[in-house]
A protein has these predicted regions:
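Extended, helix-rich structural scaffolds rather than catalytic motifs
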Residues: 1-48, 52-53, 257-391
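Alpha-helical bundle segments that constitute or directly flank the non-heme di-iron/ferroxidase center
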Residues: 28, 93-125, 188-219, 273, ...
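Conserved alpha-helical segments that form or flank metal/cofactor-binding pockets of metalloenzymes
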Residues: 30-81, 142-165, 244-246
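Acidic/His metal-coordination segments adjacent to aromatic residues that form catalytic metal sites
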Residues: 82-103, 164-200, 218-220, 268-289
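Long, hydrophobic, well-ordered secondary-structure blocks that form the structural core
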Residues: 102-178
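Inter-helical turn/loop segments and adjacent helix faces that build the functional surface
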Residues: 120-132, 154-159, 187-189, 211-231, ...
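Intrinsically disordered, low-complexity terminal tails and linkers in eukaryotic proteins, enriched
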Residues: 358-430, 448-517
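Cys/His-rich microdomains that often coordinate metals
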Residues: 409, 439, 443
């Protein structure tokens, strides 16, 4: 009698997850474990049981590829349709392009840093489950950069300012803000990297980035950007889960971890809040059709959601970040202060700025009844009047940069919106300047790291931001022109005033051809 074949019992979700994570691990014998994993102890974090780390999604690599493949098929169908049907002409206004340029120049390259960071963290954690989770997030972030590039590349065919992203990333002054954020995280230990990216950014602050950009894209007819946002949304839910799982895992492992984690939370909340001031400007000024104000977004996603999170973490001994109160007060001011900064330095930015219309000023007055009319409307109207007289304001001097966040000193003192916030520290006979108490404290804890900051303004003054062969002693030398050529700007096309720009003229002409006989 022949033996009957018996179907093998399929593994359940828990068993499959264990098989595809911890089942892949082994105890090293050729080298001691501390030599194989040299970085998971030097930050002072104590881990007693790596098996306590469990991914609530229990996602394994075979399932991961299946889900991502399905999403990619849908995404690239939309991208192709958008390109074939001239979807770029369906956006509300060519001013919206500046928001996408800012995202492409300043946010998308950060994805590459996060890829490197999670790949490294996955290599240096001893726990198999944490390594697999970090590996999948590294692949996620690589995919996000690729889909953003493929979605936005269609705009590069028709409009200025989308070119030379990698070249600009290492050189342009305002891009040093996200670049320094990413490099600070990337040069941290693996646990600090998790708190910086997975917790502080992905869990606490990510909605302040993705909701404004993706909702703004939907409101303004940019279906290509909306689609890559939706395609990334399910990934972001896993990333947020990794963030909360990471911090709770660290806090539950040993009481000695609490003060270390608290210091990281203080640091990275403030660094993230400063970085997102660029998003606040975009929300309040760059979207022709607005979703909500920065103030409203901060109240929902930071104060309500973040406040509930820190109340939950209080049982572990974690308090709200040191900069919490100052960041909440700044919600009334930062978007206006950053917009005015970029308006005046618009000649040195690879996107356009403009004077808001009367309707847009009225909208801002209703959204910021306590501050806008008192502090910012008069300045904007003054600049608009000068522009109408043919005296468009461009700053030709260089601003002082904060050593930590690298934003020009444009923010004001907490409690006094009429006074620029300015702090100084002398370290080894050198003077360092900061925009706030919190940036100064971050420097004070890691001075040897931040004295190495590559500050664009300082580098320009040192003569390090000119193309080879440029002679600064020549009689006709124009330093601003030389720096912008070093940035690889197409002068008069990528930068400057929106009104009368090539992007404005082309969009109007192409829209007219598409909608008229």
């Amino acid at each position: 009698m022949m033996d009957m074949k018996v179907a093998k019992k399929k593994l359940g979700i828990k068993e499959r997850y264990a098989h595809m994570t911890r089942g892949l691990g082994w105890e090293p014998t050729y080298q001691p474990a501390d030599a194989v994993f040299p970085y998971d102890k030097y930050e002072g974090i104590k881990i007693h049981d790596w098996d306590k780390w469990v991914d609530p999604f229990r996602l394994t690599m075979d399932a991961y590829w299946k889900y991502q493949g399905e999403k990619d098929r849908k995404l690239y169908a939309v991208i192709e349709a958008f390109a074939q049907n001239n979807g770029h002409l369906n956006i509300t206004d060519a001013r919206y392009l500046s928001a996408i340029k800012l995202f492409w120049q300043g946010v998308s390259p950060l994805e590459n840093y996060v890829v490197q960071g999670f790949a490294r963290a996955g290599r240096h954690f001893r726990g198999e489950a944490s390594r697999v989770a970090c590996q999948m997030q590294a692949v996620d972030e690589l995919r996000h950069y690729q889909t953003q590039a493929h979605s936005i590349s269609n705009y590069n065919k028709y409009y200025n300012g989308f070119h030379s992203q990698r070249h600009m990333w290492d050189r342009v002054w305002y891009l040093s803000v996200p670049k320094s954020f990413g490099e600070d995280a990337l040069t941290s230990g693996p646990f600090e990297f998790l708190i910086a990216i997975s917790f502080s950014f992905e869990y606490v602050l990510t909605n302040l980035l993705f909701v404004p950009f993706m909702s703004g894209a939907a409101y303004n007819g940019d279906m290509s950007t909306v689609t890559f946002g939706f395609s990334a949304q399910s990934d972001e839910s896993r990333h947020m889960t990794l963030g909360i799982e990471a911090i709770k895992f660290l806090l539950e492992q040993d009481p000695a971890n609490v003060p270390i984690v608290q210091r990281w939370v203080d640091k990275w909340f403030w660094r993230g809040a400063r970085l997102l001031s660029l998003v606040g400007m975009m929300m309040d000024y760059m979207l022709p059709k607005r979703v909500m104000s920065w103030k409203e977004a901060w109240e929902i996603y930071a104060e309500e959601n973040g406040g509930a999170l820190f109340r939950d973490l209080a049982r572990y001994g974690i308090r709200p970040p040191k900069g919490w109160a100052d960041a909440c007060e700044a919600k009334e001011h930062i978007s206006h202060q950053v917009w005015l900064l970029f308006y005046e330095y618009g000649g040195a930015a690879a996107f356009h700025t403009w004077s808001p219309t009367d309707d847009e000023l009225d909208w801002l007055s209703t959204k910021y009844p306590n501050t806008f009319d008192k502090y910012y409307r008069p300045r904007i109207e003054f600049l608009r009047e000068k522009h109408a007289r043919g005296e468009r304001v461009y700053q030709t001097t260089l601003p002082t940069l904060c050593t930590t966040c690298q934003i020009p000193l444009a923010f004001t003192e907490p409690g006094d919106p009429t006074k620029i916030s300015h702090r100084e520290t002398v370290y080894k006979d050198e003077k360092y300047v900061f925009c706030s108490d919190h940036c100064q404290e971050i420097f004070a804890h890691e001075p040897e790291k931040f004295v190495q900051s590559w500050l664009p303004v300082n580098q320009i003054y040192q003569g390090n931001c000119f193309n080879p062969g440029v002679d600064p002693t020549a009689p006709d030398f124009d330093p601003l022109k030389a720096v912008l050529e070093y940035f690889r700007f197409n002068l008069g096309r990528d930068n400057g005033e929106f009104d009368g720009s090539e992007d404005q003229r082309n969009f109007a002409a192409w829209r007219g051809q598409a909608s008229k006989n």
